């Protein structure tokens, strides 16, 4: 039995409805924080403990874990959806950056310029990463994924890391903002998931790749789906842009679907 898969199911049953309830009853729209209380503490503790157990279970079972793709059609759809959302988000961000530059063309402070460059690089990487996932989706559809070049997956890794840096820049108090903390954790897990993802598709150190996608794929899906549930239930006071919510949802589903191909030998 794959312990991580079992722990993910338990985590989803506990954390998703609990965070949804807290988002409705304990969320302060003005501060972006959850009000302190027993349930809030229980949620954070459960999320942290279960995530650690998922990681530990995967690494303890490393030698027993195996990987075999049995849902290539589903992965094809999810990869193309994720790629499409990434491209749309990147293009939208580039247009906004272009308009911002045109509006302040006469006077662009150095501090603002560095932010524009970071946002621009992140948007470009989003577009390139989207193209990578669309191509991967086509490969899944045609069932031609053996020995796929893993070098192209450096672009999604760069995009995710730039998105994390941009989030820290815009929200220094991110640790107290549950939806952005979950977003950040999802991106970090996605980055590490891609390390295993590229090893599997490139057929390089397959065992290590299987362990990494099993560990970080399920954790990333847990963080992303938990965040999505909270944002959907608090749609009227949603603090994240709708595009980000859709992106995290698509990203989480892809991580989950890919990681579900792992199993443990008896």
Segments predicted by a language model, with ranges:
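Membrane-interface capping segments at transmembrane-helix boundaries
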Residues: 57-66, 260-266
